[in-house]
């Protein structure tokens, strides 16, 4: 019997052409449990036997595929497909040789040994010569020393001389301590035996073209951008930059470096790669390869308030890359790889100089009656009227942060609304309240507010809190909440927003760690224990989408119908509006007279479209923004901290309280019973 495991059409073709053999194929199933490929027919025949246990067999049409290998196992032919590993993101050159199944990150072959990319080594016979492999290129160079004193001392068995003392740039370093001089990412120094020794990092030669390289922030050496793939290179030949060199051919990389293609590896040697002085004929290379560099010969560049060493590169403003060349600063525009779209699960980030694809952050949205959409995309409704954990870090016993929401019935029979949002960061408690009012540890504050671990500011019609922990909270001052979690928090969160692990099926894990089959049980398990009485009479069930009168139903559908209008049409093909429409109708049917309850669904749909890079033409400022204060008040991010009322408007004296954000009465009006009125209209005392 001939067994196949997931080899698809090749197995089917071979079995159909071999009527005398029984093929037992292990079928692959799709997500619905339906067999793929060979599910359409049953193949019959006799058993394929073999004699030599463990022998690798060649079977036409099957083993022609380099990923499939057939062996004799228990006297029967068994075939298996090789599974290819995922290449590292740092792999800049992937190769696939003829006859091989999987792609590999290009390594190096040198003197009969094989080395992985980024590996560095030194030979005992040549301890002062450094060799390093980088995507098929071996760079051979001498250890580069940096000397900062006039009379350095050379030591037997050491590549670099040392300078007396361990005081460097005015700082006293301890024995064994390693440090970097200010402004030099490429130089490392150490304090050994009461003396200082400094070594400058030698950067590997890259196989990619120069315009496809960049220096990552905070690093010394450039790296290749993206990943190149090469198939079926001629045996022994080398790919370097955009050219292919035959085995044994040589070329000059620059005036000081000669390269040779040896057995598919480019070996590049610096001309002054050994300790000692330079010959007269190599004066042009001495600046690059001298092991001893006296201080007076070191040419540096000053750019802004920083000092850069000769040969050092850095990113400047306006997306330019600069280099220090023999004491002169040279800058050029940064070359970017054109990117127009990203694979599923990633977004195009245009914040830097070059667009890059980054993992999408997790987004949890709460809006309306309220409707919850978790980080992993599960939607549910819950009308509790207490305070609940929206999300927190569950990866450690003492959660470094948590976001709480407090719900309010707002005089409805069956529904509740989000009344306020509270962010707890260590000892700090930030409360986002109605009409975009903000309290920090109980005191109202003005905007913007910048603290060590968070920043609060008004972003258009939304209040935005950005934390160093990786959370970003948006609040509209009414009942819309959006929590954005950075990708590094994946799998660490819990609460009403779910666990952010990429699977919506396990989002209903309660506060006790057990999965809940009922949404209400799940939500109540995240209730914050307090002495406050927050229960209300038993909620009336809502069997229908809308239980109001005909007039109420007509108003609900009339307002929510705008989701289908031209203002949102550009997004319909990308983000389905049906869920938001149902939520809108539900909210409108239990909507208090003074509220525009469609706003939350419209805002949630608009934000979902914006996250997909689609601009819609709806703006909430006219009817929905919380900055549109009522009863004569106006919104101000830094309004007076002392409220003028009918009881105190004529009192003389300055206000010593700091300004606060929120709705305030204009200077010529006073607050009375929630309304701004003229002082002459105040009731007599």
Swiss-Prot record:
Q: Which residues are glycosylated?
A: 116, 247, 255, 318, 441
Identify the keywords attached in UniProt to this record, alphabetized.
Answer: Disease variant, Disulfide bond, Glycoprotein, Repeat, Secreted, Signal
Give me the Gene Ontology terms describing cellular component: extracellular matrix; extracellular space
Q: List the signal peptide residues.
A: 1-39
Organism superkingdom: Eukaryota
User: Where does the VWFD domain lie?
Assistant: 362-535
Q: State whether keyword Ion transport applies.
A: no
InterPro entries recorded: Kielin_Chordin-BMP_Reg, Ser_inhib-like_sf, TIL_dom, VWF/SSPO/ZAN-like_Cys-rich_dom, VWF_dom, VWF_type-D
- KW Disulfide bond (keyword) present: yes
Q: Enumerate the SMART domains for this protein.
A: C8 (SM00832), VWC (SM00214), VWD (SM00216)
Give start and end of each VWFC domain: 50-105, 108-163, 164-225, 238-289, 299-358
Q: What is its main location?
A: secreted
What biological-process terms (Gene Ontology) are attached? blood vessel development; blood vessel endothelial cell proliferation involved in sprouting angiogenesis; BMP signaling pathway; endothelial cell activation; inner ear development; negative regulation of BMP signaling pathway; positive regulation of ERK1 and ERK2 cascade; positive regulation of SMAD protein signal transduction
Q: Which residues form the TIL domain?
A: 629-682
List where in the cell it is found. Secreted
Recorded disease is: Diaphanospondylodysostosis: A rare, recessively inherited, perinatal lethal skeletal disorder. The primary skeletal characteristics of the phenotype include a small chest, abnormal vertebral segmentation, and posterior rib gaps containing incompletely differentiated mesenchymal tissue. Consistent craniofacial features include ocular hypertelorism, epicanthal folds, a depressed nasal bridge with a short nose, and low-set ears. The most commonly described extraskeletal finding is nephroblastomatosis with cystic kidneys, but other visceral findings have been described in some cases.
Q: How does it assemble?
A: Interacts with BMP4.
Protein name per the record: BMP-binding endothelial regulator protein
Q: Please name the gene that encodes this protein.
A: BMPER
């Amino acid at each position: 019997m001939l067994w196949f495991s997931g080899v698809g059409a090749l197995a089917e073709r071979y079995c159909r052409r071999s009527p005398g053999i029984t093929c037992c194929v292990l079928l692959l199933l799709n997500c619905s449990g339906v067999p793929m490929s060979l599910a359409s027919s049953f193949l019959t025949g006799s058993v394929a036997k073999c004699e030599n246990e463990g022998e690798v067999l060649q079977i036409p049409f099957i083993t022609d595929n380099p990923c499939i290998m057939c062996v004799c196992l228990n006297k029967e032919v068994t075939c298996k497909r090789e599974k290819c590993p995922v290449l590292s993101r740092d792999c800049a050159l992937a190769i696939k040789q003829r006859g091989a199944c999987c792609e590999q990150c290009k390594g190096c072959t040198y003197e009969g040994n094989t080395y992985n990319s980024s590996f560095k080594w030194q030979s005992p016979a040549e301890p002062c010569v450094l060799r390093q492999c980088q995507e098929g290129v071996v760079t051979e160079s001498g250890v580069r020393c940096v000397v900062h004193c006039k009379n350095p001392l050379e030591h037997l068995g050491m590549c670099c001389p040392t300078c007396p003392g361990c005081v460097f740039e005015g700082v006293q370093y301890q024995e064994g301590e390693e440090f970097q001089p200010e402004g030099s990412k490429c130089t490392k120094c150490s304090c050994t035996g009461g003396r200082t020794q400094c070594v400058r990092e030698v950067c590997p030669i890259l196989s990619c073209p120069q315009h496809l390289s960049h220096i990552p922030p905070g690093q010394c050496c450039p790296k290749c951008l993206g990943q190149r793939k090469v198939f079926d290179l001629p045996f022994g030949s080398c790919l370097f930059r955009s050219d292919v060199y035959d085995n044994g051919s040589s070329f000059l990389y620059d005036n000081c470096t000669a390269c040779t293609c040896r057995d598919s590896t480019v070996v590049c040697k610096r001309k002054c790669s050994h300790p000692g002085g330079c010959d007269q004929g190599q004066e042009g290379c001495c600046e690059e390869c001298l092991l001893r560099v006296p201080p007076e010969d070191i040419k540096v560049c000053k750019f802004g308030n920083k000092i850069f060493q000769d040969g050092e590169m850095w990113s400047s403003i306006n997306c330019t890359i600069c280099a220090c060349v023999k004491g002169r600063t040279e800058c050029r525009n940064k070359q970017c790889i054109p990117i127009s779209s990203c694979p599923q699960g990633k977004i195009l980030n245009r914040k830097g100089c070059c667009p890059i694809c980054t993992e999408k952050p997790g987004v949890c949205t709460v809006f309306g009656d309220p409707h919850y959409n978790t980080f992993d995309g599960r939607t549910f409704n819950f009308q509790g009227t207490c305070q609940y954990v929206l999300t927190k870090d569950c990866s450690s016993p003492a959660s470094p942060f948590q976001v709480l929401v407090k719900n309010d019935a707002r005089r409805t029979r069956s529904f509740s609304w989000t009344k306020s949002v509270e962010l707890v960061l260590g000892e700090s408690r930030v409360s986002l309240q109605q009409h975009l009012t903000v309290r920090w540890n109980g005191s109202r504050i003005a905007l913007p507010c910048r603290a060590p671990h968070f920043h609060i500011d008004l972003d258009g019609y939304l209040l935005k809190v950005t934390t160093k922990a990786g959370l970003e909270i948006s609040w509209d001052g009414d009942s819309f909440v959006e929590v954005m979690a950075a990708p590094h928090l994946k799998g660490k969160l819990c609460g009403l927003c779910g666990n952010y692990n990429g699977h919506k099926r396990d989002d209903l894990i309660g506060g006790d760690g057990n999965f809940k089959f009922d949404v209400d049980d799940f939500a109540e398990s995240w209730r914050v224990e307090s002495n406050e009485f927050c229960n209300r009479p038993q909620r009336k069930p809502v069997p229908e989408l809308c239980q109001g009168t005909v007039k109420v139903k007509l108003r609900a559908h009339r307002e929510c119908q705008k989701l289908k209008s031209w203002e949102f049409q550009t997004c319909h093909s990308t983000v389905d509006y049906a869920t938001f429409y149902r939520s809108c109708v539900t909210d409108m049917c239990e909507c208090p007279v003074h509220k525009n309850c469609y706003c939350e669904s419209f805002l949630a749909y608009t934000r979902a479209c914006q996250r997909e890079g689609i601009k819609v033409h709806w703006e909430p400022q006219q009817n929905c923004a919380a900055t549109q204060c009522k009863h004569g008040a106006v919104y101000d991010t830094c309004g007076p901290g002392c409220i003028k009322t009918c009881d105190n408007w004529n009192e003389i004296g300055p206000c010593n309280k700091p300004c606060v954000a929120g709705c305030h009465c204009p200077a010529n009006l006073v607050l009375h019973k929630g309304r701004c009125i003229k002082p002459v209209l105040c009731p007599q005392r």
